[in-house]
Amino acid sequence: MPISANKYFLLVGVFIGDKMKKEAAKLNEDYVVENAAIQRLKNLGYSYKHGSELTPEYNERESYRDAILKNRFIKAIKNINPWLTEELALKVYKTVTNIDNPDFNMRGKIFYEMLINGVKLEFKENGEKKTRFVKLIDFENINKNEFLVANQFEVEYYYENGRFRRPDLVVFINGIPIAIFEFKSPKSNQTAKDAFNDHKTKMKDIPQLYQYAQILVVSDGLETKYGSPTSDWDRFFVWEGVESDDDVEVIEVDNYGNTMYKYKGNPYTSLDILLMGLFKKEHLIEFLEDFIIHDKKKIIATYYQFYTVKKAVDRTIKSVLYGETPEDRRIGIVWHAQGTGKSITMLFYAKKALKQKELNYPLLVFLTDRLELDEQLYNVFSSVFSEAERAESIAELQELIKKTPGGIIFATIQKFGRKSKDEHYPFLTDRNNIIIIADEAHRSHYGTLAQNLRKAIPNASFLAFTATPIDYKDRSTFLVFGDYISAYPIDKAKRHGVVVPIYYEARLVELHLTNEFIDLEFDEISERVANDPETKESIKEVFAKLEKIMLTEDYLSKVSKDIIEHFNKRLQDFDGKAMVVTISRKVAVELYKWITKQPNAPKIAVVMSGNKSKDPEDFHPHIRTKKELENLAKEFKDPESDLKMVIVVDMWLTGFDVPCLHTMYFLKPMKNHSLAQAIARVNRVFKDKPGGLIVDYIGIADDLSKSLSKYSSEARKDLMTDIKVVIEEMKRRYEKVTSYFKNINYKDWKKLSSEDLSLLTVKAYQRVAKDDNTKKEFVRNVIALKKLYLLARPHPETIGIKDDLEFFEMIKKMIVKYSTKKIREISQDLENDIQSLISKSISAKELVDVFEMLKKEKPELSVLSDEFLSEIAKIEYKDYVRDVLIKILNDDIRVRMAKNPIRFKKFSERLNEVIEKYRIKVITTAEMIEELVNLAKEIRKAAEEGKELGLTEEELAFYDLLLSYPNIPLTDKKRVEKIAKEIARMMSGYIKARDWKKKKNLQSKIRAKLKIILMKEGIKDYSLINKISDDLFEYAKNIYAI
């Protein structure tokens, strides 16, 4: 069951105390989330001010366009930097508030450098030129900083005068807006995603506020996420910890991902957990200092990265300061599932560890087991740490370790090897602040090479990161690195939306080859040798028999044809990329030739290493320089590029992220973590990608099962889901949906005339329109069926249900069209992740139902006319009639209220009353239809009163507004009519001007004219004139909404 808004409101009382609960009851429900957040932050020691108190009038800032609270800022930096004079503090303020760069991201980066490193200040003291850095935040003495939370903080548009935006909540540290919150009420029809969209809108209008923000938070009370100002929605994360990454228990998750938690025995919402975890003062300061990096965008840590790095650094300090034996210098192992940002976690670790005083500027040596991985990791780090070194040889590594006082070095593990068995690896240094950090630390050779590491650097400490589970049967990894520091498994990552699920499909099973070879004792090439094509080829002789079969014309013909047919059908549903994994370079080249012969083959490339002076001539087009490979990788990663498919052998199977990659075809036997790493290429989050698909042409499922048998059942289950499971669930859901339409023949609906089809859909609509619960259930089932269909495509089982699914989609669209906002919200939420896919594959055609057909047949009739209402009421399917009438009235009232709320607001309230009476079964369907028809007639009559008075629609709106003021000295309605006409006539001249609503000079003229008209009619009270003229102007903006 979904978590209810009522449950949220109930828990608010638990979270914020009885006093606040009583106060919350008095508040508009729209502000419940906001006020709960304020109270939680006050409990955490934050000061509070309403935004109306942080204005120029209160001397908090110079203008509404300013985002930094000037006086608080100057007071804080003088407190943190006692040597700072008032004059110099003002100079710092001007520097921070005048960041000169046209690019929003660059302004954010420049400010973050000021925030962390201080503001460079050049000044003269006693005639001597000096340079010092001014701290904006005291990261060491937290209590020296001022923490302030403010709601409804009003900021003027950056590019336009007189228009304002008010973020729901802003957290200031020392007068600087560090975090911005947007909320939606849990009882509204909007969600946290809508709050995210609000951020994006406000960011365009008031960028001068958002350029300082490091954290954006969105919440509807039930779902809460945070991200950076440059994050897309799929990079907004949950926060699921208070003091560590495992101290919060999930007690309830609904269909939309909304979560309830338990912490120390008490229930909490997601918003409370985020505030208690991330916005605890000590945590927030630490987060700002150590867990934000700028690359092309601002990247901020997830909760599991934050707590993991904190623990890893604490253990590092203990190891360096107190580790007397090799066992004491084992820091531990970080296991974070594939696709969850392991490289970024390592980067945050480096950033934090390097500045720890206890470590005395340590030397961090990052080790990988392949040149490709070494280069990838180095490239990630070098954009942040320009001083990072990369060892190209054993001798260079030894020299760097001897001479480098501290910093970062990258190398492959093989550089700790020996050229011959008789050679001894030399002693390098006895420093104790060298940290060996292994990437993917479960290769068997770490145990052997660790001996050389210990001899060379006897006092080094050891830390490991891995993306696949460690084999508990092989204790060598734990003997070298220690036990787990943190584990972030794939099931959590999927629940948090950090990765997408992976599905498995076996195709051309008759061609599967590995069963007879599965027991061959071969090591993965990527684990055993350096990046040398000749050496690789000699080892690959083990695969000779397999390769020979795969090079036959029959095999290549069948596989190449099937790959292209399968992938092109996938592209019909969602755009993206594919990767084909082959056993050898020869198979890769031959398969490329066959694939490019296929009709409608996409643009494709082979990615492999080689040497043109030694390799066969047909290899040459596929052997690229380093720069050419970089350009090819860039092209493949670009979702908009024409390069849709690559064929690989070993390269790009680990550490290579292509979020738009959604399909992998395997023609290569793989084992253990190498297989787990390879298939994880397709689990990256990208827009509305529903999942990744592994297509097996060789039999890796058996190998995967054997390889993962040593891991927990959870790890095996979460790694991959067989497409057969999806097919079975699709069939079950299909049967569920068809059960709504028993004895209705819809199978040949595409052959029906428009009139017959409209009658059929209304008949089908009647079956699912009994009540809101039935409608919700139907909508959920159809959307679930669509998702399963998309995941299963292009499996043959999907062909038979495609037409039926399109019919179900038509009925679902009718339900959403003629139903309450809540049902529309459910549909929007559930389909959010597949929105762009639907139109490509299974979108229902635009249906002209009975109501739409009636409007087409009799376009001269108003939808509120007696004749039209009579025609609608004659339709035999009364649930449909009821919903259509509600839709007509809702739409009509909404349009009329926008222009004349005074006259038509009462009808909106009446409509809601009728709907509520029906909901609680006070009236029947027939009685409800009768009341709705009567209400429609009253609305029509109210609208026609203007004609009887000789007033246009616009004049009537002004007329109603003027009559609504009880103390206006106008008792003669004829005089009011005259004023309304004069106002409308005056406005007709101004509205012709382009952008009249935005031009300040025109607005001033209009307001002045309105005041003159009112004074001319005998209104003397100037405050009343101001009030009425302001209201009339706002009315005019709605009336003339052009």
Swiss-Prot record:
It is an enzyme of class 3 (hydrolase). Gene3D superfamilies: 3.90.1570.50, P-loop containing nucleotide triphosphate hydrolases. Pfam families: HSDR_N, SWI2_SNF2, T1R_D3-like, T1RH-like_C. The keyword Translocase does not apply. Transmembrane segments: none annotated. Residues 323-487 form the Helicase ATP-binding domain. A motif (DEAH box) lies at residues 439-442. GO terms for biological process: DNA restriction-modification system. It catalyses: Endonucleolytic cleavage of DNA to give random double-stranded fragments with terminal 5'-phosphates, ATP is simultaneously hydrolyzed. Keywords: ATP-binding, DNA-binding, Endonuclease, Helicase, Hydrolase, Nuclease, Nucleotide-binding, Plasmid, Restriction system. GO terms for molecular function: ATP binding; DNA binding; helicase activity; oxidoreductase activity; type I site-specific deoxyribonuclease activity. Its EC number is 3.1.21.3. SUPFAM superfamilies: P-loop containing nucleoside triphosphate hydrolases (SSF52540), Prismane protein-like (SSF56821). InterPro entries: Helicase_ATP-bd (IPR014001), HsdR_RecA-like_helicase_dom_2 (IPR055180), P-loop_NTPase (IPR027417), Prismane-like_sf (IPR011254), Restrct_endonuc_type1_HsdR_N (IPR007409), Restrct_endonuc_typeI_HsdR (IPR004473), SWI2_SNF2 (IPR040980), T1RH-like_C (IPR021810). The restriction (R) subunit of a type I restriction enzyme that recognizes 5'-CCAN(5)GTR-3' and cleaves a random distance away. The R subunit is required for both nuclease and ATPase activities, but not for modification. After locating a non-methylated recognition site, the enzyme complex serves as a molecular motor that translocates DNA in an ATP-dependent manner until a collision occurs that triggers cleavage. Belongs to the HsdR family. The type I restriction/modification system is composed of three polypeptides R, M and S. Type I restriction and modification enzymes are complex, multifunctional systems which require ATP, S-adenosyl methionine and magnesium as cofactors and, in addition to their endonucleolytic and methylase activities, are potent DNA-dependent ATPases. This is Putative type I restriction enzyme MjaIXP endonuclease subunit. It comes from Methanocaldococcus jannaschii (strain ATCC 43067 / DSM 2661 / JAL-1 / JCM 10045 / NBRC 100440) (Methanococcus jannaschii).
